[in-house]
Amino acid sequence: MEPVDPNLEPWKHPGSQPRTACNNCYCKKCCFHCYACFTRKGLGISYGRKKRRQRRRAPQDSQTHQASLSKQPASQSRGDPTGPTESKKKVERETETDPFD
């Protein structure tokens, strides 16, 4: 380490600032320009304001699409399609026929 003049502010120490200014180029050399460029360009991390993305507009026939959704058959519930009452009756019949030892 080189001795640093104690009268200099920390941001003016030699080696604390790169010799060239940061730019918008994303080449390999510019991505490794300084710590800030590496995190922003190399890693893609930025803590600034997020750009507002515009929503995609719905096509003009969106009403027909909604109508086709309502015409679809309702989804059936999962499980035994015969229903819980018949399955209970089956269990009762099986328990009655099994002999108790």
UniProtKB/Swiss-Prot annotation:
One of its GO terms (molecular function) is cyclin binding. Residues 38-48 are annotated as: Core. Keywords: Acetylation, Activator, AIDS, Apoptosis, Host cytoplasm, Host nucleus, Host-virus interaction, Inhibition of host innate immune response by virus, Inhibition of host interferon signaling pathway by virus, Interferon antiviral system evasion, Isopeptide bond, Metal-binding, Methylation, Modulation of host chromatin by virus, Modulation of host PP1 activity by virus, Phosphoprotein, RNA-binding, Secreted, Transcription, Transcription regulation, Ubl conjugation, Viral immunoevasion, Zinc. The keyword Transport does not apply. Its main location: host cell. A motif (Nuclear localization signal, RNA-binding (TAR), and protein transduction) lies at residues 49-57. This is Protein Tat. The gene is tat.
